[in-house]
């Protein structure tokens, strides 16, 4: 069977082989036999890019001809994953290139491994943005991703003595073949200084002029976003920072070395890392700089692009939407106002009318800590004119609140954009945009009824839900080619662009042969992951064991701690009852903790310490293994999703906005073990409660405890010997070589209220026994191999709702109102 139809005559095999050889010669002055694997990767990528650029040009020409409305998707993160394999799949040329490289003596899988994961994001926020760009291109909509070209990303995670160590992720060290530098579109971005007000007699208005500022040049680098089998190539534009003035040789010659490179360092600092530690003033200032830097450059570019083809900026909302991915880009509201007022000479009312019909905001969190607030002192000093504009937005917004709720001072306190010395960015986005969306039905309900209740009461028409989705082209076709081929053999390939077609697989739920094939594919993927674990961790795991997986950003609300405490409980059970019939389990973790997040980093140490004890205990005969996968990222995630039996989605109910890992596991036939939180609720609706393992407090119960009190974790400690035993092991040296203090902070966080932090903030002890019971149900279900296979197949068959294609179409229909574009032959 030919896995992919042939799209492009450029991929005639002989021509492609010739292009690779020529590229090796041109780039490295070598023959193909002398080239390293990295050099072959660069040469192959350039040959592929050559085809992409033809389509990229054709796409731009079509957009110029059709003049469609554009969505600018503004995000601090784009977690793209490797581009080579994904581009080949979307060009429908994977098979041909694989064969061509085979004939040249190279393995495409090995060549793909030479590509670094672009370090442009960290967690679900950035991966969602990447999936959305894939879907926008595949569906044929004109879109630009806008972000920052971080030189070192968040960090590369090393595990040393069980602890996370952060090292720079130098992903650009060999050059990145899938980017184009575009200095002709550079934009100046200004920081600091002061605002001079000058009366303009001609217009009878004040002019506001920023002076005494420092500035940097924002230089765009463009990455192609290839649509599936449609010749459309959209653009991810990431901004690098360069100094306005070059290296000062005169200062250097005087020995003033620091001053000679001052401008260069100012620029470099902005783009070095994603999410610099903001536990101090300098870190906060740098984060704010980063946000304004990419927002200002992106909005300037969007306005310039609009003015090339249109005379009247009042038509901007008909042709442009700025989608703000979380609170980081919400300064867009004020920056757009600045440009319209100061550079385009508009009156406030007309500028506000344009802005509030152009900006739309996606809320990604219920966690108050992530709804960004900036100290006035910092904000007004770094961005004096933008701050003035926000002050005026706030003044007018408060008047609007007073008109609607006369005499209600409490409303003003809760809703003001500037209050108590802070600028509240989510409030700015809601006041200054026309749409506010949550990312799963439960999440949106909680926003409307609880977190953003006052705003919902004032602007109910702005609020809507868009449940997240994932691209099946990366997370099934590329991540799990064996399963992708099997599905296509059974139901055709329509699912590649219409995921609900997976429902056709339901007819195989009682077909023993089909179930056997399905589980054999799962086994082969487990063998593949076991090999990766052996190579990277030096741990031998049994592919016949249950692969129980939790991979996601490390945060207390995601409750990796509950997972590892349960592993400790299981280990205690096996040690106490060595004769018990226990089905072998492999618990797999992968997570990065923010560099300044002490408790999260200590949880990683605990996981690795427990792993050291359990994996080296010969007396349990390998019944239990614990693996922490270092430097979790998109490329190893693809191996993990394909191999998982159990998908751990165990956040405290009401805390996870949506989650998308849950969807990737489901698509690949893993069963969800989780709380009724985020998109888990909708997953259970699709697959049926009988095909998932649900436990724990509900969102309403959690919110009730938080609002009214009454939760005492000490009750569980005092009344449940299993829980008490596990928690005592945190402080009796069991997993710390006799060091009683190593994990004391974790113990304290669960049992001792500390200042504003309530003991067991995320209800781990309340849910522990319910979780353990659900785990017992998992084991019982897995022992029934045919029943388990049916559940696995149905999870894949019911995943159709969770494509980002569906999500994007909903954004288009209900928020953006874009027109499809087709490339004319």
Q: Where would I find each of the regions flagged by the language model?
A:
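A conserved ligand/cofactor-binding region detector
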Residues: 2-825
């Amino acid at each position: 069977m030919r896995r992919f139809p042939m799209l492009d005559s450029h991929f005639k095999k002989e021509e492609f082989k010739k292009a690779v050889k020529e590229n090796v010669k041109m780039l490295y002055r070598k023959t193909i036999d002398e080239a390293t694997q990295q050099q072959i990767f660069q040469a192959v990528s350039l040959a592929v890019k050559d085809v992409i650029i033809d389509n990229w040009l054709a796409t731009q020409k079509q957009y110029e001809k059709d003049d469609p409305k554009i969505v600018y998707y503004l995000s601090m993160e784009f977690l793209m994953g490797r581009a080579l394999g994904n581009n080949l799949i979307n060009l429908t040329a994977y098979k041909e290139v694989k064969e061509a490289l085979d004939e040249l003596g190279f393995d495409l899988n090995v060549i793909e491994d030479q590509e670094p994961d672009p370090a442009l994001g960290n967690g679900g926020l950035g991966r969602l943005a990447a999936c959305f760009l894939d879907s926008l291109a595949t569906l044929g909509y004109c879109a630009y991703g806008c972000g920052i070209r971080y030189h070192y990303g968040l960090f590369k995670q090393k595990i040393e003595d069980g602890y996370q160590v952060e090292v720079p992720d130098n992903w650009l060290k060999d050059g990145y073949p899938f980017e184009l530098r575009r200095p002709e579109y550079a934009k100046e971005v200004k920081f600091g200084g002061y605002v001079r007000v000058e009366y303009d007699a001609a217009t009878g208005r004040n002019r506001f002029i920023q002076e005494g500022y420092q500035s940097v040049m924002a230089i765009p680098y463009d990455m192609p976003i290839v649509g599936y089998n449609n010749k459309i190539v959209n653009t991810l534009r990431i901004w690098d920072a360069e100094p306005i003035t070059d290296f000062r040789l005169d200062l250097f010659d005087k020995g003033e070395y620091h001053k000679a490179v001052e401008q260069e360092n100012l620029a470099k600092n902005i783009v070095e890392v994603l999410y610099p530690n903001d536990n101090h003033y300098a870190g906060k200032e740098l984060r704010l700089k980063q946000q304004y830097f990419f927002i200002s450059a992106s909005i300037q570019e969007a306005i310039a692009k609009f003015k090339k083809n249109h005379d009247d900026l009042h038509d901007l909302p008909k042709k442009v939407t700025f989608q703000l991915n979380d609170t980081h880009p919400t300064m867009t509201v004020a920056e757009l106002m600045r440009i319209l007022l100061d550079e385009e000479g508009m009156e406030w009312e007309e500028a506000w009318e344009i802005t509030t019909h152009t900006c739309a905001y996606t809320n990604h969190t219920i966690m108050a800590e992530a709804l960004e607030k900036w100290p006035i002192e910092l904000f007004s000093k770094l961005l004096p004119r933008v701050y003035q504009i926000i002050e005026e937005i706030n003044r007018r917004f408060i008047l609007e609140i007073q008109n609607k709720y006369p005499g209600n001072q409490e409303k003003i306190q809760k809703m003001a954009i500037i209050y108590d010395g802070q600028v509240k960015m989510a409030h700015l986005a809601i006041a200054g945009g026309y749409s506010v969306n949550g990312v799963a039905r439960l999440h949106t309900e909680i926003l409307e009824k609880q977190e953003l209740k006052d705003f919902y009461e004032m602007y109910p028409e702005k609020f809507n839900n868009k449940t997240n989705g994932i691209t099946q082209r990366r997370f099934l076709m590329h991540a799990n080619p064996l399963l992708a081929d099997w599905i296509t053999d059974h139901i055709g390939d329509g699912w590649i662009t219409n995921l609900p077609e997976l429902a056709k697989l339901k007819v195989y739920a009682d077909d023993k042969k089909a179930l056997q094939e399905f589980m054999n594919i799962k086994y082969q993927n487990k063998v593949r992951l076991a090999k990766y674990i052996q190579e990277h961790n030096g741990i031998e795991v049994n592919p016949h064991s249950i692969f129980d997986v939790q991979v996601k950003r490390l945060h207390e609300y995601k409750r990796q701690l509950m997972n590892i405490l349960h592993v400790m409980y299981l280990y205690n059970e096996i040690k106490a009852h060595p004769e018990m019939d226990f089905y072998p389990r492999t618990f797999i973790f992968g997570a990065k903790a923010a560099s300044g997040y002490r408790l999260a980093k200590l949880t990683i140490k605990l996981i690795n310490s427990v792993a050291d004890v359990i994996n080296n205990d010969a007396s349990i005969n390998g019944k239990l293994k614990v693996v922490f996968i270092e430097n979790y990222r998109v490329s190893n995630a693809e191996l993990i999703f394909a191999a998982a039996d159990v998908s751990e989605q165990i956040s405290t109910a009401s805390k996870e906005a949506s989650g998308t890992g849950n969807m990737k596991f489901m698509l690949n036939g893993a069963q969800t073990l989780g709380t009724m939180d985020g998109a888990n609720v909708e997953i259970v609706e699709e697959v049926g409660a009988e095909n998932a393992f649900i436990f724990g407090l509900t969102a309403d119960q959690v919110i009730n405890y938080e609002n009214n009190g009454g939760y005492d974790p000490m009750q569980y400690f005092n009344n449940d010997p299993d829980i008490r035993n596990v928690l005592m092991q945190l402080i009796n040296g069991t997993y710390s070589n006799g060091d009683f203090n190593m994990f004391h902070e974790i113990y304290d966080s669960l049992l001792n209220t500390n200042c504003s932090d309530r003991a067991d903030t995320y209800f781990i002890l309340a849910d522990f026994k319910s979780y353990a019971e659900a785990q017992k149900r998992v084991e019982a279900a897995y022992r029934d191999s045919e029943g388990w296979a049916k559940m696995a197949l149905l999870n894949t068959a019911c995943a159709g709702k969770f494509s980002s294609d569906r999500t994007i179409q909903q954004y288009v229909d209900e928020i953006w109102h874009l027109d499809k574009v087709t490339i004319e032959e």
